[in-house]
Amino acid sequence: TALYGPATKVGGLVGYNAGTVKDSKVDAKTLDLSNLIANDSTVTAGGALGENTGTGEKLNVFTDLTDSMAKYLNLGGVAGSSSGTLSKCTYTGAIGKDNGFTTVGSTVGGIVGSNDVVYNTDGTAAATGKVKDCKVGYIELKVQGASNVGASQDAATKMNSAAHIGGIVGRNRGEITGSTVGNKDKTGSIITARSGFVGGVAGSNSGSISTSGGLDTQRLVKQINAWLEVPYKNETTTDENGNKVTTKVVDTDKQNDNLNQMVRVLTGKASGDAEKKLQIDFKAMQGFDTLTYGEKDYNKVYTNRSYNQLLVSLRGGSGWGHFANGYLGGITGFNDVTGQITDSASGQWFVYADNINQSWGAVGGVIGQNESDAESNSGLVNFAAVRRFVRGKGRWDGRYNASNDDDANVGCEEYSTNANLVDNYVGGVIGTQENRTGDRWTLEKCVNIGTVFNSR
């Protein structure tokens, strides 16, 4: 499908939607903007809707969005941007190219690029973008990305200093609920950029994400929550006047039983048929680190992706000194001050930070960099294999050179002893926790089940 003429809001069905578009399908090989008359970084485009302030429901998009990347500001599989509602929408296809151009502030997402909030003059929300029960099946999202982020910047400055790349939403300021990425078959989807905020669900989050993440993870998240829920019982005692007093107290026996069962199931020591069934289900959901347990071949990480449902990656440029800059997380790369995430889990994924900036890049199975001031981020589960890797220097004619490519094996064995490397951090749930607003942050019912590897 080719589009012609001047425009900055472009959709496979509707350029600007303030009404309702539902029960529609876009099935085109590609959405071609090469003949569109527009300046760079000005176009908001989606496979179905350009800008949405109304409702898009049951929109199923099967198309590639890979042309004229320099023109985009907001790009999404279903909608470019939305302050309305996107409900029960699906996307399958390719977005961007290996080094497809995106600029600071740009957004790219499997469902919508930018999920927005519109404010009244008094600061209250007039409209909130909602992504509900949407699904991204097979996706190849590959962009260059962009980042001018520095470790000393405050959260607001960071949000405006990077590209936002996510499997469902690029930049989320609204609400994401009940939405997933992945297929039942290990089809090897990929979300990758060389710079910016990258996440399996959202590149960045300053809104809310709940009950979202990997396919078929929700029942296992509910089981984790049940194990970690504090049980209570009524206890009757007699006071100093001989009166019976009933109070609610923690049932420590039940609590210990639940925790012991969780440990048995998650460590492969299940007892009884019910526990063994759970053990199989949890084990089957774990992501696979192809560089630890697979072929251990760096030049096949990006081409042979059949081990996992999804590869989420920040991918540095060729050579030891060409670092990727940004934050990488299974659910979100950057959780902003107002961001809140609940009851969500990465899936059978590989979260891979390849040659990421040593000084301030952050990598986490759920959240890369967390600066949230939310009262609680709870019910977070990581199933993904998480790896952060800094390349060694390649050799050529006996001299050290920055010559190894980002998918080459040369020099990779030297990473652990190279004197130029500095300490860096990777986490199963959170890569880095930044207390910019004091000590007001709480994690509840969070569990890492995936493997975690750091090259330092």
Language-model features: locations:
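Surface-exposed loop/turn motifs in large extracellular/passenger domains
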Residues: 1-456
